[in-house]
Amino acid sequence: MRKRILDVAIDYARDHKYDRGLAACVCAVIFIGGRVISVGYNTKGRDSGLQRRYRTNPHCCSIHAEVAAVLNVRRKIDLTGAKVVVVRRFRDDSAKNPKLVMARPCAMCQAVLYSYGLKRAVYTITNDEYGVMNLTDPRRDDKGNPSFDENTSGDVSSTHDEDE
Protein backbone atom coordinates (compact mmCIF):
# COMPACT_ATOMS: atom_id res chain seq x y z
CA MET A 1 0.00 0.00 0.00
CA ARG A 2 1.33 3.43 -0.97
CA LYS A 3 1.73 6.13 1.64
CA ARG A 4 -0.41 9.24 1.46
CA ILE A 5 1.37 12.30 0.12
CA LEU A 6 0.96 14.10 3.46
CA ASP A 7 2.61 11.20 5.30
CA VAL A 8 5.50 11.23 2.83
CA ALA A 9 6.00 14.97 3.41
CA ILE A 10 5.82 14.52 7.20
CA ASP A 11 8.54 11.85 6.96
CA TYR A 12 10.79 14.22 4.99
CA ALA A 13 10.12 16.98 7.54
CA ARG A 14 11.04 14.73 10.47
CA ASP A 15 14.18 13.29 8.86
CA HIS A 16 15.84 16.62 8.02
CA LYS A 17 18.46 18.25 10.28
CA TYR A 18 17.28 21.87 10.57
CA ASP A 19 19.27 24.94 11.58
CA ARG A 20 19.20 25.08 15.40
CA GLY A 21 18.22 28.76 15.27
CA LEU A 22 14.85 28.01 13.73
CA ALA A 23 11.89 27.86 16.12
CA ALA A 24 9.78 25.89 13.66
CA CYS A 25 10.91 23.61 10.87
CA VAL A 26 9.16 23.80 7.50
CA CYS A 27 9.40 21.27 4.69
CA ALA A 28 7.80 21.52 1.23
CA VAL A 29 7.55 18.47 -1.02
CA ILE A 30 6.52 18.82 -4.67
CA PHE A 31 4.68 15.86 -6.20
CA ILE A 32 3.76 15.05 -9.78
CA GLY A 33 1.57 11.98 -10.22
CA GLY A 34 2.26 10.85 -6.66
CA ARG A 35 6.06 10.92 -7.19
CA VAL A 36 8.37 13.17 -5.20
CA ILE A 37 9.93 15.70 -7.59
CA SER A 38 11.62 18.08 -5.17
CA VAL A 39 12.02 18.73 -1.45
CA GLY A 40 12.80 22.10 0.11
CA TYR A 41 13.43 23.21 3.69
CA ASN A 42 13.41 26.62 5.33
CA THR A 43 16.90 27.92 6.00
CA LYS A 44 18.10 30.80 8.13
CA GLY A 45 20.16 33.72 6.92
CA ARG A 46 19.80 33.22 3.17
CA ASP A 47 17.78 34.80 0.41
CA SER A 48 17.29 34.19 -3.29
CA GLY A 49 16.59 36.32 -6.34
CA LEU A 50 13.29 34.50 -6.77
CA GLN A 51 12.30 35.26 -3.21
CA ARG A 52 13.40 38.92 -3.48
CA ARG A 53 11.18 39.30 -6.55
CA TYR A 54 8.03 38.02 -4.82
CA ARG A 55 8.52 38.84 -1.15
CA THR A 56 5.97 40.92 0.70
CA ASN A 57 7.99 41.29 3.90
CA PRO A 58 11.26 43.23 3.38
CA HIS A 59 12.61 41.90 6.71
CA CYS A 60 12.39 38.24 5.72
CA CYS A 61 15.91 36.79 5.94
CA SER A 62 15.40 33.14 5.15
CA ILE A 63 14.56 31.00 2.17
CA HIS A 64 11.10 29.56 2.61
CA ALA A 65 10.69 25.82 2.07
CA GLU A 66 8.26 26.30 -0.84
CA VAL A 67 10.74 28.57 -2.67
CA ALA A 68 13.62 26.17 -1.98
CA ALA A 69 11.62 23.26 -3.46
CA VAL A 70 10.89 25.26 -6.63
CA LEU A 71 14.52 26.46 -6.92
CA ASN A 72 15.76 22.87 -6.81
CA VAL A 73 13.98 21.92 -10.05
CA ARG A 74 12.70 25.03 -11.81
CA ARG A 75 15.13 24.74 -14.73
CA LYS A 76 14.86 20.95 -15.03
CA ILE A 77 11.18 20.05 -14.73
CA ASP A 78 7.94 21.71 -15.82
CA LEU A 79 5.97 22.10 -12.59
CA THR A 80 2.66 22.82 -14.31
CA GLY A 81 -0.07 20.83 -12.56
CA ALA A 82 2.14 19.71 -9.67
CA LYS A 83 1.11 19.69 -6.02
CA VAL A 84 3.09 20.86 -3.04
CA VAL A 85 2.65 19.59 0.50
CA VAL A 86 3.92 21.94 3.22
CA VAL A 87 4.58 20.67 6.74
CA ARG A 88 5.51 22.85 9.70
CA ARG A 89 6.67 21.14 12.86
CA PHE A 90 8.18 22.15 16.14
CA ARG A 91 11.67 20.92 16.89
CA ASP A 92 10.45 18.40 19.49
CA ASP A 93 7.86 16.88 17.13
CA SER A 94 8.04 13.10 16.66
CA ALA A 95 5.83 10.28 15.45
CA LYS A 96 5.04 9.40 19.07
CA ASN A 97 4.54 13.02 20.13
CA PRO A 98 3.34 14.90 17.02
CA LYS A 99 3.56 18.68 17.03
CA LEU A 100 2.46 19.78 13.58
CA VAL A 101 1.21 23.34 13.20
CA MET A 102 -0.08 25.83 10.63
CA ALA A 103 1.99 25.74 7.43
CA ARG A 104 -0.21 27.80 5.10
CA PRO A 105 2.03 29.26 2.37
CA CYS A 106 2.57 33.01 2.78
CA ALA A 107 1.58 35.47 0.05
CA MET A 108 5.09 35.42 -1.42
CA CYS A 109 5.18 31.63 -1.61
CA GLN A 110 1.67 31.54 -3.10
CA ALA A 111 2.86 33.89 -5.87
CA VAL A 112 5.94 31.74 -6.57
CA LEU A 113 3.92 28.51 -6.67
CA TYR A 114 1.33 30.09 -8.96
CA SER A 115 4.02 31.51 -11.27
CA TYR A 116 5.50 28.05 -11.76
CA GLY A 117 2.12 26.44 -12.50
CA LEU A 118 1.57 24.36 -9.37
CA LYS A 119 -2.13 23.59 -9.03
CA ARG A 120 -2.59 22.81 -5.36
CA ALA A 121 -0.96 23.31 -1.98
CA VAL A 122 -1.80 20.97 0.89
CA TYR A 123 -0.58 22.18 4.28
CA THR A 124 -0.71 21.16 7.91
CA ILE A 125 -2.98 23.07 10.30
CA THR A 126 -2.73 20.83 13.39
CA ASN A 127 -1.74 17.22 14.04
CA ASP A 128 -5.13 16.10 12.74
CA GLU A 129 -6.10 18.78 10.23
CA TYR A 130 -4.83 20.01 6.90
CA GLY A 131 -5.84 22.72 4.46
CA VAL A 132 -5.95 22.70 0.69
CA MET A 133 -5.31 25.77 -1.43
CA ASN A 134 -6.30 25.83 -5.11
CA LEU A 135 -3.51 27.68 -6.92
CA THR A 136 -5.13 27.85 -10.35
CA ASP A 137 -7.65 30.67 -9.89
CA PRO A 138 -6.22 33.69 -8.05
CA ARG A 139 -7.87 36.84 -6.86
CA ARG A 140 -5.66 39.92 -7.06
CA ASP A 141 -4.84 42.14 -4.12
CA ASP A 142 -4.52 45.93 -4.41
CA LYS A 143 -0.90 45.55 -5.61
CA GLY A 144 -1.83 43.02 -8.31
CA ASN A 145 -0.37 40.04 -6.44
CA PRO A 146 -2.25 36.74 -6.67
CA SER A 147 -4.17 35.64 -3.59
CA PHE A 148 -5.79 32.24 -3.16
CA ASP A 149 -8.61 30.85 -1.08
CA GLU A 150 -8.59 27.54 0.71
CA ASN A 151 -11.29 25.30 -0.68
CA THR A 152 -11.22 22.45 1.82
CA SER A 153 -9.95 21.53 5.22
CA GLY A 154 -10.19 18.11 6.67
CA ASP A 155 -8.88 15.06 8.39
CA VAL A 156 -5.33 14.04 7.45
CA SER A 157 -6.49 10.50 6.71
CA SER A 158 -7.97 11.64 3.38
CA THR A 159 -4.85 13.04 1.72
CA HIS A 160 -4.46 10.47 -1.04
CA ASP A 161 -3.25 11.74 -4.38
CA GLU A 162 -6.51 11.63 -6.32
CA ASP A 163 -4.79 12.13 -9.69
CA GLU A 164 -3.46 8.59 -9.80
PLM regions: where:
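Zinc-dependent deaminase catalytic domain
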Residues: 1-164
